[in-house]
Amino acid sequence: QYGAKCVFIKHETKPMSSSDIRDMLPNRRGASYLPESVYARIIKNGDYDAKPELYWLRDKAYAMLSPKRVAHVVGCEAEAVTLANRWGEDPENAAEAGILHDITKKLVLSDQLILCRKYGIINDNAEEENVKLLHAKTGAALARDLFNISDEVYDAIRWHTTGKPDMTLLEKIIYMADYIEPNRDFDGVDKLRKLAYENLDEAMALGLEMSLEDIRSYGQEPYYATADAYKWYSDHTAQKQ
């Protein structure tokens, strides 16, 4: 009647309501029902108490890594989940921290410092000159900005390089998973792996001691947080014996 030309497009629909999707989001589901940009914004803002689906989070994290680093992160996530199941930690939090712990590792010092200024990160003189120290702090801050991670996951990323005295269970799991994941190959790693599943605090003491010895073997002075962490875990485990 009006000269219109109608085109019928065949498209498979999914029976779904907005309330169904809102119910999915806190349970790490729903990404496939939303446009990528919408889902990313929901995760960033923490809308509807959303938690990121782990496959989606992996894609985002791996895009920020070198190919060699991806293999390490895959191993770290798997090790973190296994340790979490062994010691009674939430395996999804362990997976999330494992996936995200190195997202700024490939950035050069100048880019690390740009992120520090952006997120208001205060550093001491040693940190200002050391990418290895900075990436734990900038990685935690960037992960919180992009993915609205919990305080527990933030702290696990924040302390995964140096350690610190009296760490939470999740912090210890990520520190140890980073150290002993299957791609790691160094003298003593098998002993450390075994101990991590028998006595996590003793494994922390041994791992921190090995880290201090490695740093000193290069003629460098260990960062104070690592030395403090070793003293705490060494004293703590000695008191229990």
Residue ranges of predicted features:
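Generic secondary-structure signature for well-ordered alpha-helical cores
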Residues: 26, 85, 162, 213-220
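Classical nucleotidyltransferase
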Residues: 1-52
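Charged phosphate-binding loop/patch that engages nucleotide di/tri-phosphates or the phosphate backbone
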Residues: 30-54, 213-241
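Divalent metal-dependent catalytic cores for phosphoryl transfer on phosphate-bearing substrates
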Residues: 59-64, 72, 81-208
